[in-house]
């Protein structure tokens, strides 16, 4: 039984997992909409589902209560080892994509202003030039969110220039360039390519790393160790650009997660075309 959280990305990843399992003749039951992070994790630990995709940073910080590690390989190896020791959970190969917090700007504005990194953004804000910065409520108060970002990059946004919006509307507001010059986004969101935005590089590596990997209970893995080999090339192919494009097909074009997943797998020869 394959589970997933409710976000578009999780729905697409869940359908990828089902198709991969079927391609190695395993029977996969679709439980792709379990709920939020905690509910999905509990479903795995309790045996209601056997496999789902989790993010390294989420498991390390939220489930294991540790401080983020700012190297994606080291973060993955640490969470893989500790989750197995403490919870009997096996982590399969991780994705290169990292769905973390970031700041974006309209691509042509970034070029005009010569902005490539968050250090560039901080310098621009310190110089007092016009333009608001938009963030979502949760990010505003999280210690690993905005307060820490301003400390890490040494800038402070004047009260009148900081706008707090819900996560969804921020993308369009950056594209419109009226309310927001800069906005907080998630790196693999499909609206980034759809709306012509560009993500500023986190050159001081402030934000936690959220690489994804399929995870499953050890007893299931021990019965089907060949699953690891089936997933490895697929995880490896899921870069930020690929994941954002699959998310875009889901969010902007309204395609079903199943079709998005199977078309991509088929095009790249991971499964038979048209299956």
Where are these regions (language model features)?
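Extracytoplasmic "Venus flytrap"
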Residues: 1-15, 33-36, 138-141
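Ligand-binding pocket segment of bilobal, Venus flytrap-like solute-binding proteins
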Residues: 50, 128-202
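Beta->alpha turn/N-cap motifs
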Residues: 36-37, 47-60, 75-76, 167, ...
